[in-house]
Swiss-Prot record:
Gene3D superfamilies: 5' to 3' exonuclease, C-terminal subdomain, 6.20.10.30, BRCT domain, DNA ligase/mRNA capping enzyme, Helix hairpin bin, Nucleic acid-binding proteins. It comes from the Bacteria. It is an enzyme of class 6 (ligase). It comes from Rhodopseudomonas palustris (strain ATCC BAA-98 / CGA009). It catalyses: NAD(+) + (deoxyribonucleotide)n-3'-hydroxyl + 5'-phospho-(deoxyribonucleotide)m = (deoxyribonucleotide)n+m + AMP + beta-nicotinamide D-nucleotide. The gene is ligA. Pfam families: BRCT (PF00533), DNA_ligase_aden (PF01653), DNA_ligase_OB (PF03120), DNA_ligase_ZBD (PF03119), HHH_2 (PF12826). Keywords: DNA damage, DNA repair, DNA replication, Ligase, Magnesium, Manganese, Metal-binding, NAD, Zinc. One of its GO terms (molecular function) is metal ion binding. This is DNA ligase. Its cofactor is Mg(2+); Mn(2+). InterPro entries: BRCT_dom, BRCT_dom_sf, DisA/LigA_HHH, DNA_ligase, DNA_ligase_AS, DNA_ligase_CS, DNAligase_adenylation, DNAligase_N.
């Protein structure tokens, strides 16, 4: 990521009026980046670019101190808390640190401390890795965790107590003796590099947003409205500081003694932290940790130096937005220059087509980099997610000399192009409109940056996930054929597309499934019987099983009920697909599809794109040849007491399963919802009904027992 700026005027030549204008521009730009970083967890520029903006701001304010005001980023910390979480006032402000970028700046810091304290020598300093995560304050009363808050703007943060209780590294009760009655303990929430990569892989497979780096993933995971999402994320916590303390747990407290106490109290303290007795020791630590940086399991972006004695810290105090007794020694951005030899397209399990830069091998931060993500078509063209130019609008071409940076020490990315070295014959990159794996045509939906392969049924890159979907509970639901079996059969080449499932029995003389570990003649016979039982399938299950983008269970039922029979559905879809053009679709078949209540343009276009791909039609025809019957959709009745009503089922139902209840309600014309709202007409509550029942009562929604529901529907 690079800052998007025009050539800035030389500070030495600035007049006061011009300085005022430049300060206003810098303050607005920095405030925007602070919001993106602290509130949105989506920084738009690199740390190095951000630091450069701040240093320019500080230099101009130093030259024109009369232009400094209270709202300047040099006088504030972070950004105001985001909406959605309760606000928490910090008893002791969580201020940010001043930065040093060179050894002599660290030496100047140490000399300032020595002079301020009027000491003969530089005092002892604690050096610790600067974790690239999210700052957190934990308030304990009588040893019990009562509140957790983010830093926010340094004075007011967000209450994230419920989410923090799911982090294993944060004790709910402090251990040991000498626990202060009140203590605010602070540290950093972070995510290990390997956990970040695994999370992003799961996000991609689930067709969810992937995170740019471990810091963003940690921040986004902590600030979830749904605590179960936070609990599912592998968050870690390092303790390293404190705020309000009713008293200290030892006499003559020091920084390193307090860190030892935090360790005994049940926190994880970074084992790399070192007590240094000179500036030379501190700088040696900086160099040593810098060399280890690439091999550390977590991200760091520098080293923090803190005066060890707490009485010295108290005497030194604070200046504007940072303490006098601490400073952050930042690492330079890890970048290198190399040649982009080729752009390849990778196809994910959901059909997403991602461009990857193949680079001449280059070492960045101690790691050999040969590939870099190019994200999507717009990124290659020099367009950001917000539609604004990135890299000053410069596109990326094969043959370009590029600057590569390891973002967050994990994902290599291209941050700029060396235009002076662009080959004369370099052509703009044209994103492929066909899948490089299966040859199916690709589509890019309006409002999205990603191109997707439409060969859902036949693309090898998508096969495993599509086949798992095909046999899932709401689709064909074949007993004995789950995700593990699909993975095994696909790996052996036995099942590549849905029709192959129904030919397993005919091919078993060659395959010999009964010889597989965990199988025998009886289990294989049962599997074949379960497959044969599904040769007759309801239309809505078949439509859902096809794995068409945006067609979930609900939309599959809408389509099945509208068309009624398989023949009518296929005839309409083929007619709409035949009329599809780049300019759009004005056919009667498409208009009929688009006008189905609850479908709309996005779903209609996805369905037509599926049927416009001949390879999908071929795979579907092969499947239908193996089926004996596709049952017509049962039309919802309109003459019942619940027709047109919205119903929610909650709790443990004893007279029917949840699926049976849902199916019966839909046959009677009711709409079954998953959550309670003002639009809900009935809530049917079984045993141990929880929050949905409570909400229904609060909203005045009619609550029925199972017997009352059965009486209402006349059963």
């Amino acid at each position: 990521m690079t800052a998007k700026t025009k050539p800035a005027p030389d500070i030495a030549t600035l007049t006061k009026p011009k300085a005022k204008v430049e300060l206003m521009r810098l303050r607005l730009e920095i405030e925007g980046h602070d919001k993106a970083y602290y509130q949105d967890d989506a920084p738009k520029i690199s740390d190095a670019d951000y630091d450069a903006l701040r240093r320019r701001l500080e230099a101009i304010e130093q030259k024109f101190p009369e232009l400094v005001n209270a709202s300047s980023p040099t006088q504030t910390v972070g950004a105001a808390p985001a909406r959605g979480f309760a606000k928490v006032q910090h008893a002791v402000p969580m201020l940010s640190l001043g930065n040093a970028f060179a050894d002599d700046e660290v030496a100047e810091f140490a000399l300032r401390v020595q002079r301020f304290l009027k000491l003969d020598d530089v005092p002892a300093i604690v050096a610790e890795p600067k974790i690239d995560g999210l700052s957190l304050s934990l308030r304990y009363e009588n040893g019990e965790l009562v509140r957790a808050a983010t830093r926010g703007d340094g004075f007011t943060g967000e209450d994230v107590t419920a989410n923090v209780r799911t982090i294993k590294d944060v004790p709910n009760t402090l251990k040991g003796k000498h626990i202060p009655a009140t203590c605010e303990l602070r540290g950093e929430v972070y995510m290990l590099k390997q956990d970040f990569l695994a999370l992003n892989k799961r996000q991609e497979e689930a067709n969810e947003t992937v995170f740019a780096n471990p810091r963003n993933s940690a921040a986004g995971s902590l600030r979830q409205k749904d605590v179960t999402v936070t609990a599912s994320r592998p968050l870690k916590f390092f303790a390293y500081a404190w705020g309000e303390m009713s008293d200290y747990p030892m006499e003559e407290p020091t920084q390193h003694k307090m860190l030892q106490w935090l360790d005994h109290a049940g926190f994880v303290v970074n084992p790399e932290i070192t007590l240094c007795h000179s500036v030379e020791d501190a700088l040696a630590f900086y160099r040593r940790i810098g060399e280890k940086r690439a091999s550390l399991p977590y991200d760091i972006d520098g080293v923090v130096y803190k005066v060890d004695r707490l009485d010295y810290q108290e005497r030194l105090g604070f200046v504007s937005r940072s303490p006098r007794w601490a400073i952050a020694h930042k690492f330079a951005a890890e970048q290198a220059t190399t040649v982009l030899e080729k752009i390849d397209i990778q196809v994910g399990r959901t059909g997403a087509m991602t461009p990857v830069a193949r680079l001449q091998p280059v070492t960045v931060g101690g790691v050999v980099v040969q590939n870099a993500t190019l994200h999507n078509e717009d990124y290659i063209k020099g367009i950001g997610n917000d539609g604004e130019p990135i890299r000053d609008g410069v596109d990326i071409r094969e043959g370009d000399t590029v600057v590569v940076q390891r973002a967050g020490d994990v994902i290599p990315q291209i941050v700029s192009v060396v235009m002076e070295k662009r080959p004369a014959g370099a052509e703009p990159y044209h994103f492929p409109h066909k899948c490089p794996v299966c040859g199916s045509h690709a589509v890019r939906e309006e409002g999205e940056a990603v191109w997707r392969c439409t060969g859902a049924l036949i693309c090898p890159a998508q096969a495993v996930e599509r086949l798992k979907h095909f046999v899932s509970r709401l689709a064909f639901d074949i007993d004995g054929l789950g995700e593990k079996q699909i993975e095994l059969f696909h790996e052996r080449g036995w099942v590549q597309e849905p029709a192959d499932i129904f030919t397993l029995k005919a091919r078993n003389a060659e395959l010999k499934l009964e010889q597989l570990e965990g199988y025998g003649e009886t289990s294989v016979r049962n599997l074949f019987a379960a497959i044969d039982a599904r040769r007759s399938i309801e239309l809505h299950r078949l439509v859902f099983a096809l794995g068409i983008r945006h067609v979930g269970e609900g939309n599959a039922k809408l389509l099945a009920r509208h068309y009624g029979t398989l023949d009518a559905f296929l005839s309409a879809m083929r007619a709409a697909a035949d009329a599809q053009t780049e300019e759009g679709n004005t056919s009667e078949a498409y208009q009929d599809l688009d006008n189905i209540a609850g479908i709309g343009d996005v779903v209609a276009e996805a369905v037509v794109e599926f049927f416009a791909e001949e390879r999908n039609i071929k795979a579907l025809d092969a499947l239908l040849a193996e089926l004996t019957e596709v049952l017509p959709a049962e039309q919802a009745r309109r003459d019942t007491a619940v027709a047109g009503k919205t119903v929610v089922f909650t709790g443990s139902l004893s007279k029917f399963t949840r699926d049976e209840a849902k199916a019966a309600a839909e046959r009677l014309g009711a709409k079954v919802a998953g959550s309670v709202s003002k639009k809900t007409d009935y809530v049917v509550a079984g045993e141990d009904a929880g929050s949905k029942l409570t909400k229904a009562k609060d909203l005045g929604v009619t609550v029925l027992t199972e017997d009352e529901w059965l009486a209402l529907i006349g059963n």
